Amino acid sequence: MSKRIAVYPGSFDPITNGHLDIILRGLNIFDELIVAVAHNVAKTGLFSIDERLDLIRETVKDYPQVRVDTFKGLLVDYLTRQNARIVLRGLRAVSDFENEFQLAQMNHTMNTQLETLFMMTSVSYGYLSSSIVKEVAAWGGDIDDFVPPCVKDALKTKFPDAPRID
């Protein structure tokens, strides 16, 4: 029997506890999960690709069945290279679904062997996004419940002049 490999793609700028929740729940379904940081030309990130990879690796270091990687180009091509057939995506709200549905349909049209598995985020993370975390961090807000400790430290470095509440 072949390994069940899924790819969880995203910008992860930075990884949040919501992302980690999807990763851990995905491990209940798949033998291997590849967290794949996309080179997205439409987004300018706060963290470099290498910084994001390092933060994700630190976050998932206790889970050997998680592999952290990066890719350029089409997701369908990346999945083919990784011998994976499943795209794992987290959904926070109906607004996420509309865009994700279109991407899933396009990916499946380009390669009918690929499927997308949507997981609803846990209720405690339904509002959480990397953008919101960055904004709260920039204003010195408490982000302890939103991100892994390594990300909190990295955000403090990115926003050294932010007012501190801790």
UniProtKB/Swiss-Prot annotation:
SUPFAM superfamilies: Nucleotidylyl transferase (SSF52374)
Main location: cytoplasm
HAMAP family: PPAT_bact
Cofactor(s) listed: Mg(2+)
Enzyme Commission identifier(s): 2.7.7.3
Oligomeric and partner information: Homohexamer.
Any one Gene Ontology molecular-function term assigned to this protein's record: ATP binding
Name of the featured protein: Phosphopantetheine adenylyltransferase
One Pfam short name: CTP_transf_like
Binding residue positions for ATP: S11, F12, H19, G90, L91, R92, E100, Y125, G126, Y127, L128, S129, S130, S131
